[in-house]
Amino acid sequence: MSTAEIVAESANLDAELRRLFGQDTRVEPLLGAAQMGRRIHGVDLTQDLSAAQASLLVALLDHYNIISFPAQGGDDFQLRHLERLANHFGAPIPHPKNYANYIDYKKKRVPLALKPVPEQTATRCNDAFPGAITCVDGADSPAVYIVTNLPGSGADLQEQVASGLHWHTDIEFEPVPLSTSMFFVQNVPTTRDALGGTWVPNTLPEAGYYHPYSPAELMQRRLSLPLNGETAYTDTAAAFADLPLERQAELEQVMLRRRLRKGDPGWLIPLVYTNPRTGRKSLHSPVWASRGKNIAPVEVEGMSEQASREFLDQIEAHVLQPKYRYDHVHQPGDITIWSNFSTLHNAPPAKSVINQPEDARLMYRISCKGEPSYSLPRQDSDAWVEANILPPYRSPADWVQS
């Protein structure tokens, strides 16, 4: 789409937002009028959505890649509200770290069990600074992954800082990859005691974290990360649209073999994703080793491992150019939703162990896959859930029914 077309479509969506949610709603760019990301004021996501409202929110995400709703964290907010919202965008997936015996379940199909309450992440968060920070109700849902530095922290402990991660999308290494992820933000760090006035110093990964032959320009872009607890994003739809048409056509023919382990046969999936609702194209997770050594590197069909790495490194360098980048500043009470098909993101350097509540980073993430559902409860078949949600999971009925 041209800049004029993007602006025109934005105006149409903004008008529809006011019609469906009220004239007090307003939209502001996170970057610029022709760039990804919008902050949407005046929408209360604790309320049930009509089918028309849910359809509009999905359309807003399709168009903007990232949408953020401030001031959602009132006294009545619970994480069931976030999980109900997630069900409109896709089927929420449970996080393996919430279970006590997930590995045994995968290998032996023993009955699943959540961790005992004292070992659950929410309990460990509450124990870090008793009385100062308490998790939001519903944090024990299997679908809620708590992104935080509170477990293992406390007033008597030595502060520690960790480096950033690889650029990635959330769980692209399954045959049906995740479509959407979202955060509810409870706490963000407010101290700025590092040299340069940031929350943390620019802490680099240890040697061997990236492939030793990664190009210097790519490494500079990979490591150019924010230092105040933001989440770094880049726009892979805009990056694809800026390529010459001939190059776009070439990349649309590329198939990637993704797999968990090197010995697995894996499966083929297109490098270029086409949004089924808009026709908009984007580069879906064009990263050779987005999980380092934890997940097998991607192979380009018909290329050797080295050629695959060099090919994808070139594309990663393209999408990480500063003109496609956006560092999202989190605020308590925000709900921020992003498309995993049209963005990459990164968790930048952060304090991993803290000794004061002012350094706390506490956010709740839910990710989902499959098609949107404008009415709830979702109508995913048992066979689809069994094949694509591991372990099989549906949100509690009383959370998603009006």
Label the model's feature ranges:
Residues 2-66, 71-332, 341-402:
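Non-heme Fe(II) oxygenase catalytic core, chiefly the N-lobe of the double-stranded beta-helix
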